[in-house]
Each structure stands twice: as C-alpha cells, then as structure tokens.
Amino acid sequence: MKGEIYVIFNYANNKPYVGQTIKGYLRRFSKHKEAAKRGSNLALHRAIRKYGEEKFWVDLLETITAETEDELLTKLNQKEIYWIKALNSKREGYNMTSGGQGLLRPTPETRKKIS
C-alpha cells in the first residue's frame, strides 16, 4: 500500500498547507481546487478563491509505503504531523490542526461492531 505527504504552497504570500492522501497528490490538489470553487470555508479553500488557483502549486514531500492499511494510516499521520511542524504550516500557513487526523477509518473492532 502507498500514500503520500504533499505541500500546497501559495507563492503570493509564502503560506504552505501540508496534507496526506492515498489517491495521489495531484488528484488531491484538484479536489482542493474543486472544493474552493464550491465555496468550502476551509482556510486553504478561501485562499484559493482569494488569490486564484494560479498562485498555488503542489509538490510531493514523501511517499509512504506499508504492508497494511492500518500501518499506512499510522505512518501517514506521523509524517503529516512531522511536516506540519517542520514547515510551521499550522501557525504560518493554512493547516488548522497539528495533523494526524486525516484519512480516519474505523478500527477493525469498530468495523465488527457496526457490521
């Protein structure tokens, strides 16, 4: 299994956003732009509307691999936390949290309970 940690950078004001995805970072960037067009109120999406899509670029920070989905999600969350801190993107960018909440999936125990 594979996931990615990416950064979206606004070169109009030098503010970053760090995220994680299992669908590919370019596809995820497109989804952020679509959400901005739909009027999403997230800070990054408001900024895309304010400055225009052409002021933003995306880059891959890391590719993460794992044997299981749970292991991948744990690694992605850990790396997202690391990069948000390293790039100071919570305080000086568009991240609203310290990271590690993305791609939440029910645990195997929860899946059993709800099935």
Describe each region flagged by the PLM.
Residues 1-113:
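Structure-specific nucleic-acid interaction/processing domains
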